[in-house]
Swiss-Prot record:
One of its GO terms (biological process) is carbohydrate metabolic process. It comes from Mycobacterium tuberculosis (strain ATCC 25618 / H37Rv). It comes from the Bacteria. Its main location: secreted. Keywords: Cell membrane, Cell wall, Membrane, Secreted, Signal, Virulence. It holds the Pfam family CBM_2. It is found in: Secreted; Secreted, Cell wall; Cell membrane. GO terms for cellular component: extracellular region; plasma membrane. The gene is CBD2. Identified as a drug target. Also identified as a potential subunit vaccine candidate through a systemic immunoinformatics approach. Rv1987 exhibits a strong potential immunogenic response useful for the development of a tuberculosis vaccine that would be used in tuberculosis models to generate humoral and cellular immunities. SUPFAM superfamilies: Carbohydrate-binding domain (SSF49384). Carbohydrate binding protein that binds chitin and cellulose. Lacks enzymatic activity and does not hydrolyze chitin and cellulose. May interact with mycobacterial biofilms, which are rich in cellulose, and play a role in biofilm formation. Could also act as an adhesin, improving the initial attachment to host cells and aiding M.tuberculosis during the initial stages of infection. Recombinant M.smegmatis harboring Rv1987 shows enhanced cytoadhesion to human lung epithelial cell line A549. Disulfide bonds: none annotated. GO terms for molecular function: cellulose binding; hydrolase activity, hydrolyzing O-glycosyl compounds. This is Cellulose/chitin binding protein Rv1987.
Amino acid sequence: MAGLNIYVRRWRTALHATVSALIVAILGLAITPVASAATARATLSVTSTWQTGFIARFTITNSSTAPLTDWKLEFDLPAGESVLHTWNSTVARSGTHYVLSPANWNRIIAPGGSATGGLRGGLTGSYSPPSSCLLNGQYPCT
């Protein structure tokens, strides 16, 4: 009988260790890495201006090891300026605040990759550059 109790104790200890290791492994796999905007950066620069308009280009770069999905690039334009057309993005407007969102083909930026696009703006009066540019609502553009 004593030999059976030792066998049962060893078996239970081994079973508990195996189950514990399995639970830790499953929980570890359930937490997948997500790219944060802190590991991404954006630039928005005006490349040309003329009396009634301007062209601006943007680049969003994913420096993380996970895909960056559904990015948002937002900025403000002064009164008298507006976005007339975008490429490689869609645009939403609320007053003088604009938000560029990805097109269907560039909504996921692979690790180490980037998405580029631009916009054509119209203006009345003198030109002022976009301001308050943020990536994903919190990280300043360069």
